[in-house]
Regions:
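Membrane-interfacial helix termini and adjacent extracytoplasmic/periplasmic loops
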Residues: 148-166, 201, 206, 225-269, ...
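Alpha-helical membrane-interface segments at transmembrane helix boundaries
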Residues: 156, 160, 165-177, 181, ...
């Protein structure tokens, strides 16, 4: 907060009175911010596209080198083709860079000088001012507008100032995508395991050991799953995938480090006992008369399970999925080891083929809360962001659970009159 003392263009004051400064600011600020948004788009999207094409050409040349050697005709032809394309891309990059410099130079002309509470003057670029309002002259509607605008920024913008300002859109996106992938991974395996234990396995010491192991797995600390995911998924499975399919990128890892896929599988493994237990209970609740009626009509055991048992048990299976989502979406400790980062330069889901990038690191609301609360340079100043992000995480988990509960209710209504 501060008192405006002058608005400068090219280091010349064009307004010195508060009313005049406010009027000129409202005239100039939208234009300046539009140039700032154009600059950010050029720097993040257009420049990123050129860099991806340059990297793809480098990897293509590396693959040809590994396959044919540097003295081969194939390598010479590929090198000539890629060199011509590289020059064209560098020209395109220079044009983008020139436009960015032009926008920076234009925005640098506009500055606002404010006097802080300590009486010291402070100069701000208009492009760096996200919003400005006369705090002591706002009526109820204006205050509501500022409040709603802050929420819009919080939900749709990217973080600024070491995550202590701005929005959490990348963290929302990462949390939702990771939770959905975790659910897609854990539900089929959990249902298959429960079907085998309940419908096919014969009672004995081996099945007893499996049930004990499943129950004990539910009590393992989450950080242990994170260590397992790092060692098995990242360093073993991921490194093997890199050796087989991404040799040209080595020694830089592709799947041999933390990423969205390994984080989802680690949390799927952690929530697997929840789905198994819930599915077993749902299968046990299916009336015996329905099974016997189906078998008496000539159906096989698998046909009975597929047509009678599973549809009737589906609401209970959905309950297990809801519990798994609720637990997995809020976990932080495993994600610190297998993919969550403080700031992700790219989203795991975007418009670039193949659209879903399973190897990328991602931001997560739970890790974002931890980072603000314990890793921020000024934890006290970050407390409002911590509380707001916590509320958002609770609401996000509740929203995903409500959607799953709605699906469960629809399935329950569909099959509630299907008794023999």
């Amino acid at each position: 907060y501060g008192i405006p003392t002058s608005l400068n263009i090219d280091d010349q004051a064009v307004a010195t009175q508060p009313a005049e400064i406010w009027e000129r600011f409202n005239q100039l600020h939208p234009e300046v911010r539009q140039r700032w948004r154009r600059r950010r788009r050029l720097e993040t999207i257009d420049t990123g596209k050129v860099n991806r094409l340059l990297e793809a050409d480098r990897l293509k040349l590396r693959e040809v080198e590994l396959q044919y050697g540097t003295d081969s005709a194939e390598y010479q032809a590929a090198e000539a083709e890629i060199e011509a394309r590289r020059k064209r891309l560098e020209e395109e990059f220079n044009l983008i860079r020139a436009e960015i410099d032009q926008l920076d130079a234009e925005n640098a002309r506009y500055k606002l000088v404010v006097q802080t509470a300590s009486g010291q003057p402070h100069e701000l670029l208009l492009a760096d001012i996200v919003r400005c309002y006369p705090a002591n002259r706002l009526d109820g509607w204006a205050k509501t507008g500022v409040y709603l605008d802050r929420w819009r920024e919080f939900l749709t913008d990217s973080p600024r100032e070491a995550n202590s300002e701005g929005g959490v859109f990348p963290a929302i996106w990462g949390t939702v995508v990771m939770t959905l992938l975790m659910s897609i991974a854990v539900v089929p395996f959990g249902v298959l395991a429960a079907l085998y234990l309940r419908e096919y396995a014969r009672a004995g010491w081996a099945i007893s050991i499996v049930r004990i192991a499943v129950n004990n797995l539910a009590g393992v600390p989450s950080i242990v799953f994170g260590v397992f995911g790092l060692g098995f998924f990242c360093y073993f499975v991921g490194a093997t995938i890199d050796q087989l399919f991404f040799e040209a990128k080595l020694p830089s890892p592709t799947f041999g480090t933390g990423g969205l896929l390994w984080a989802s599988l680690t949390l799927a493994l952690m929530t697997l006992p929840v789905v198994i237990v819930a599915t077993e209970e749902a299968l046990a609740a299916v009336p015996r008369s329905m099974r016997e009626g189906s078998l008496a009509c000539g159906a096989t055991k698998w046909q009975t399970i597929r047509r009678i048992v599973l549809p009737k048990a589906m609401p209970g299976i959905m309950t297990g999925m809801i519990l798994a989502m609720a637990r997995g979406a809020g976990e932080v400790a495993p994600l610190m080891l297998v993919g969550a980062v403080k700031l992700a330069p790219e989203l795991p889901l975007d418009s670039t083929f193949p659209f879903l990038h399973l190897e990328r690191s991602f931001m997560h609301l739970g890790f974002h809360i931890y980072d603000l609360g314990f890793q921020s340079q000024n934890s006290e100043a970050a407390k409002p962001m911590v509380f707001t992000t916590t509320l958002l995480l609770i609401c996000l988990i509740a929203a995903m659970n409500l959607i799953a509960i709605g699906l469960r209710s629809a399935l329950r209504r569909r099959y509630q009159h299907s008794q023999f």
